[in-house]
Amino acid sequence: MECLHETLAQIVPADPAAAQRARKRWDSIAKPLHSLGLLEDAVVRIAAMTGSPNVELKPRAIVAMCADHGVVAEGVTQTGQEVTAIVTENMSRGDTSVCCMARVAGAELVPVDIGVARPVTGERILQRNLMRGTRNMTQGPAMDRETCVQAIETGVDVARSLCRSGVRLLGTGEMGIGNTTASSAVTSVLLGVEPERVTGRGAGLSTEGLNRKVTAIRAALERNRPDPTDPVDVLAKVGGLDLAGLTGVFLGGAACRTPVLVDGFISAAAALCAVRLCPAAGDYLLASHVSAEPAGQMLLDALGLTPFLRAGMCLGEGTGAAAVMPLLDMALAVYDGMATFEDIQVEAYQPLT
């Protein structure tokens, strides 16, 4: 397993010269300057990530980290913990929302059992279980620091393996009943914001359930006192195996100079952990959408990312990442295939000052 410190040392800032060449290509295309907005910006950023203006985004994969959370014992979810295992196995069968969307997007879905509470079966599931779910964080740390580091390194290894197999674009996703509670706790600590401001209803909590969720987060923070300057400490004490694994996927993608799509709230919380561990990792992130969860926009602001979509989505699983992949394909269709001003013998647009 790749050592976390070695991975962090291998992450370099994106290449501004490649970005400049990609922007020059866009500006030569026979259309008004910058008229495709974020789509142009994304291709330019991807060129900088890979170090080449010749951008390729296929093959592609969405990594879904699956894990359970002991905090569900506090009544913070509408459904029981058993749902995590059921949906993880359904992912292997191609029978969840993200599976349907990934097929349209031409992406391989890679479900990873990093911490599901019971053994799961399925040919497509990567068996990487480190714990049968985290402990109840209101009673003590969700996991020990060593296990948290192993979970991050597991995510790194999954990302590296996919990149070495030729994957040019990674998406992130997750499955874990209770993971919005852990994500809200992590976000509260890293952003220095009260739990009430970053905690939402998740998969359909009542007002009473939401109050229990906030109370549980407050109890966990009071009991564990996570260090906001140490993302590993935060993840270990009030996070989850799925969050730690996703943190590793972002770091592994960055180390391989491969763009990684941030999905929604949970994915963005993990992305912030990755960037706090290694600021240069932020150069390799693309925001798919802004989650409808209360902290969705806060996290993207902290990451300095602008989402492609504002669609009111809050499903998770990687559905936002899948939804954006066809948009990137359309951007590349223009970038690679459209005539230039020189080709059609028309005077090029000039930037106005």
What are the roles of these predicted feature ranges?
Residues 1-353:
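N-terminal loops that bind phosphate or other acidic moieties
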